[in-house]
Structures are given as structure tokens and as C-alpha cells.
Amino acid sequence: MNTLIELYDERAIENVLAADMFRPKRIIFLCPTEVAQSQQRQEQISDFFRHRGWEPELIFVEASQYKVDRILRQLLSISEKYPDCALDITGGSDAELFAAGVFASKANVSVFT
């Protein structure tokens, strides 16, 4: 696995735990608009990983937290671009988690909790 998809969560530990354990080359965060557009929040996550001794590529993708069909389309699009991806479902909204379940069954990707 070179790419880990994270469902962004306001609880910071949910955004970094699996990534810190598996250390993929790339982490894609599906996140709300305010996070996707916040350099400060993105830098906080980047600083955490740097402090832990590595610098993965971080990609922040603006995503609806409540529209399952849109979330599913984004996940499928990411898996087409990064077929080596896995999905961490420790964070996110109920709609994101539902879309993640459908995505995992359609795309046959590994899922971590």
C-alpha cells in the first residue's frame, strides 16, 4: 500500500494513527471545505508527521460529509488514480462511513479501523 485514504475527523488522533502505523508514501484526506482550504490545519498534520520522522505526500480533497453518492464517486475516482490505495475508517461522518462500505465492496480495497 502506497496510498492511504483518510476520512477526516475533528479528533486529531483519528487522522494520523493508521498513517503513522502503516507509513504510506501518500495520504489522501477527504475533508470538509474549511479543512481543505486551511493551510494552518494542513500544516499541523504535516508537522506531526515530520516530528515523527517522515514526510508523506499529503493531499487534501474537499468532500461532502453528508452526500453518500458524492463521497462514493470521490472514493472511486481516487482508487482509479491510485489503485494501490487502502481506506482508514476510524473517522468521518455516518454518510462517509456508509459510502466507504459501499466503496470497499465495489473496489475491493483493504479497509482499516
Report the location of each language-model feature.
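PLD/PLD-like phosphodiesterase catalytic module centered on the HKD motif
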Residues: A86-D88, G92-S93
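Long, low-complexity, Lys/Arg-enriched
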Residues: M1-C85, F98-T113
